[in-house]
From Swiss-Prot:
This is Accessory gene regulator protein B. Pfam families: AgrB. HAMAP family: AgrB. It comes from the Bacteria. Its main location: membrane. Essential for the production of a quorum sensing system signal molecule, the autoinducing peptide (AIP). This quorum sensing system is responsible for the regulation of the expression of virulence factor genes. Involved in the proteolytic processing of AgrD, the precursor of AIP. Its EC number is 3.4.-.-. GO terms for cellular component: plasma membrane. Keywords: Cell membrane, Hydrolase, Membrane, Protease, Quorum sensing, Transmembrane, Transmembrane helix, Virulence.
Length: 188
């Protein structure tokens, strides 16, 4: 990782010199590069494991569903990059694999989605310390979160098995990040 950090540092310094960036702009550029590299690495590991377990498409469906709802509902983030990485593997690879292995029924997940509906209605959008929400945007984001939830659940009822299970699971997963127990830990 040190080699990658050094490479990012050198590239950011070159950009700073060429573009005459202030120190703050340099730090922003460097942080942006670090985020891209870290997220690329996480994606390679997560989707690589999904490929090895033959659940790539299921992982992708869960991830896309999760991100679609998260766009409007926001929610908790992991405290560290490493914890985020571990949570990604558990949430997007191991749990979908378990859903396949133990043939968790769509009906069971659908019943759990009622809990998700209550969570989204009550807690979305969930602000965090790193991603606060302006008070004037809360009502609009709540309405959009509920609409997206309904659309995703409608899609889950239309798409064939086993894909419908992973749409519902993605919604469940994202709704749990809205719970206040995670916001308190992040000190909203």
């Amino acid at each position: 990782m040190l080699l990658i950090d050094n490479g990012i540092e050198k590239m950011a310094l070159k950009l700073q010199q060429r573009q005459n960036l202030s120190h703050i702009e340099f730090l922003k550029v460097r942080l942006g590069m670090q985020v891209v590299v870290i997220n690329t690495f996480k994606a390679i590991v997560t989707y690589g494991l999904a490929l090895l377990l033959n659940i790539f498409l299921y992982t992708l469906i869960v991830h896309l569903t999760f991100l679609t709802l998260r766009t409007y509902s926001h929610g908790a983030h992991a405290k560290t990059s490493m914890l985020c990485h571990v949570q990604n593997i558990v949430a997007f690879v191991m749990l979908p694999w378990l859903i396949v292995q133990y043939d968790i029924s769509f009906q069971f997940l659908l019943i759990l989605s009622l809990l998700s509906a209550l969570i989204v209605i009550k807690y979305a959008p969930a602000a965090t310390k790193k991603r606060p929400i302006a008070p004037k945007k809360v009502k609009g984001l709540k309405i959009k979160s509920i609409i997206v939830f309904v659309l995703l659940m409608t899609i889950a009822c239309i798409v064939p098995p086993p894909y419908n299970r992973f749409v519902v699971y993605g919604v469940l997963l994202q709704s749990f990040t809205l719970l206040p127990i995670f916001s308190i830990k992040e000190e909203v």
